[in-house]
Regions:
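Short, small-residue-biased leader/transition segments that mark boundaries at the very start
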Residues: 1-6
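AMP-binding/adenylate-forming catalytic core of the ANL superfamily
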Residues: 9-13, 20-24, 194, 289, ...
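Conserved helix-loop-beta element of the AMP-binding
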Residues: 16-19, 40-62, 143-145, 171, ...
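Conserved pre-ATP/AMP-binding loop-to-beta segment of ANL
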Residues: 54-58, 63-69, 73-107, 114, ...
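AMP-binding/adenylate-forming catalytic domain of the ANL superfamily
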Residues: 59, 418-439, 458-461
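Gly/Ser/Thr-rich phosphate-binding loop
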Residues: 79-83, 183, 188-196, 205-269, ...
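Conserved structural elements of the adenylate-forming
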Residues: 85-88, 99, 104, 118-139, ...
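Conserved AMP-binding/adenylation subdomain of ANL enzymes
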Residues: 126-143, 153-193, 207
Length: 461
């Protein structure tokens, strides 16, 4: 990850890392300094003789830069150490690999707390990449721009691996996402596809000089990682020529995609659902007692099939909380599935706000507020309230040059949505707290507002 800090490196111990590959630095993060602080033994050891008291299983570190860092291999030097004997050993290792063995310990983003290491197998990610590529109709003639992080399933599976299985050209616009760099790559490389989370597409569409880029070669891609606002999807299709843009839904624990829209789905379906279930995957919607609901009824979405992870690494308790004895992955998402099999994600089970006994779904309010011409992005969540149990709060990023107030928001909502769904509190911000993969962290927004407003959590029986 490009946003790592020393406290996050507990992963080295958690998953018993034996070899670590690192860049020298990225933006404000100096990885070499972090590692030398954590592993002082590096200063006095040979690269192949690392013995770290805090990380006893770590055998060696490889750094990709040009510096000769004490105790570490340079990537190029390490590559040159390989000989014919090593190649022969690799062939032997390859013959002993099995499809159900772990290939990736993928840490979840942690929108609600400490990340967990999802154990993904060869079967999990290779097949998921294959079906995603087929949904996008990727071929050897396509050129896919991948500005999303490669340390996340979005970049690794839906980007790199999907290109490998289809023979598609990969285009990387930069070390990290930059809207201008991405637009320039799309234009110069005549890309036919591009991936991104909603905030990335929003950033590109709002770039100064957006109209100067020729994006007519584009046709497809995936927008995923967070709920896609309807108005944003319409702009992506009309202004970026992505008429075959797909929406994908899933989670790290399901390798990641379980639902995806087709390139020829009606635009109405693509802006209002996450598509239909992927091949060889099952889905169901259940109520709080676990009863399977009828078509169109709302409840928690469960998925099952080849794509479900083996479990959280060395964490059977949290694995059992997420995957039941019948193999169903409990997604934590509220959803409906219609008679044609299209799934609509209503929100997170934990994000649902209960105001005065009324169930309020933040995404519904977010979709409505995004129709306001002065609002660029919005996140809605609940905060404690002595009278109603919870009240509605909205964090808003305004369009450039616009000012938004609580009165503006309330008057815009008045008569258009139910009174109990109208935000009681509004905070105008320039950005949201996000995970490194671009997902808004509502729990941090909730904590900030609770503290700023001096609210107290209401105790319930």
């Amino acid at each position: 990850s490009s946003d790592v800090c020393s406290s996050d490196l507990y992963a080295l111990v958690k998953v018993s890392v034996k070899a670590l590959i690192t860049a020298e630095s990225f933006k404000s993060s100096n990885y070499l300094d972090m590692l030398t602080d954590l592993i002082p033994e590096l200063a006095n050891c040979e690269p192949e003789r690392l013995s770290a008291s805090k990380f006893p299983l770590l055998n060696f570190i490889i750094q990709t830069g040009k510096l000769n860092q004490a105790g570490m291999f340079r990537f190029q030097d390490f590559m040159e150490k390989g000989g014919e004997g090593d190649k022969a050993r690799l062939v032997g290792i390859d013959s002993k690999l099995f499809p159900e063995e772990p290939i990736n310990l993928q840490f979840t983003s942690g929108t609600t707390g400490v990340p967990k290491a999802a154990t993904l197998t060869h079967t999990n990610i290779v097949n998921n990449a294959r079906f995603v590529a087929e949904s996008m109709q990727l071929t050897q003639k396509d050129r896919l721009c991948i500005p999303v992080p490669l340390y996340h399933c979005f970049g690794m599976v839906l980007g790199n691996l999907a290109c490998v299985v289809g023979g598609t050209t990969m285009v990387f616009p930069g070390e990290g996402f930059d809207p201008v760099d991405t637009l320039e790559a799309l234009n110069a490389e005549r890309c036919t596809g591009v991936h991104g989370v909603p905030t990335m597409f929003s950033a590109m569409l709002n770039c100064t000089g957006f109209d100067q880029y020729d994006l007519r070669s584009l046709r497809t891609g995936i927008m995923a990682g967070a709920p896609c606002p309807i108005e944003l999807m319409k702009d992506v299709v009309s202004k970026m020529h992505l008429d075959q843009m797909t929406i994908a839904y899933g989670m790290t624990e399901t390798s990641p995609v379980s639902f995806q829209s087709a390139v020829d789905d009606p635009i109405e379906r693509r802006v209002s659902t996450v598509g239909r279930i992927q091949p060889h995957v099952e889905a169901r919607v259940v109520n709080e007692s676990g009863t399977v609901l009828k078509v169109g009824e709302q409840g928690e979405l469960h998925t099952r099939g080849y794509l479900v992870m083996r479990g959280y690494w060395d964490d059977p308790e949290r694995t059992a909380e997420s995957i039941d004895s019948d193999g169903w992955m409990h997604t934590g998402d509220l959803a409906t599935i219609d008679a044609d099999g299209y799934c609509n994600i209503v929100g997170r089970v934990k994000d649902m706000v209960i105001r005065g006994g009324e169930n309020v779904y933040p995404r519904e309010i977010e979709e409505f507020l995004l129709s306001h011409p002065g609002i660029l992005d919005v996140q809605v969540f609940g905060v404690p309230d002595n009278k109603y149990g919870e009240e509605i709060c909205a964090w808003i990023i305004p369009m450039a040059g616009n000012e938004i107030s609580l009165d503006d928001v309330r008057s815009y909502c008045d008569g258009q949505i139910a009174h109990y769904k109208i935000p009681r509190y509004v905070k105008v911000v320039s950005e949201f707290p996000m995970t490194v993969t671009g997902k808004p962290q509502k729990y941090l927004m909730r904590e900030t507002m609770t503290e700023d407003l001096k609210l107290h959590q209401v105790k319930t029986a």
